Amino acid sequence: MPRNSITIFTGLALAAVLFITASAASEDLSGYNPTYSMGSEDKDWWTDYPNENPNPGASVDHPSWVLQSLKEKPVIILLHSASCKSCAAQMKTLSQILKTYRKDITYYNIRVDSNDSRGREAFEAYDPTGGSNYVPTTIFLTEFKDTMGKTSLAWHSYEDAMSESDVEAYIKDAIYYYRQSNGGGA
């Protein structure tokens, strides 16, 4: 085989290996049972405002950039400030866990003490207690198909730093529910 052909063949083989490796990087959730269910209690996934909100059961006006992102995969939004110690802890936790799940999640890291209007929009839409604007606030969003086959947007938000196990559970749930609602297996 001529030298140029070997180089091209080697390059194609390497590209195929990289593609297969990247494709296999998605987390396998076959046999996974979600940690949190749909509902209106504190740790549940919500489709409307939860019981702790001043408007329990009211519909959420989801920002357009969130809806656009959810067309691809589940979303995590971290709202934080530069001078917040618990924000730094939450960023570290998310950074560590996203090493495993980054391919399956769209992540927004938004400083609320900047001029990014998405922070205000996210607080308005996803503050579980309505109006406190506490940081850090971590928001998990996914699609969910109910027993009648209707797909809804489900979300959960948490004010303060979270344990690594809770963050990972919400991420895995989000990926699982998203895949189930979009016809894919876990």
Where are these regions (language model features)?
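N-terminal targeting signals for export/organelle localization
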Residues: M1-P56, A174-A186
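Non-catalytic, surface beta->alpha helical segment in thiol-disulfide oxidoreductase systems
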Residues: N133-A186
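Short active-site neighborhood of thiol/selenol oxidoreductases, capturing the structured segment around
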Residues: L67-A82
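Thiol-based oxidoreductase modules, predominantly thioredoxin-like and allied folds used
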Residues: V60, L79, K103-R120
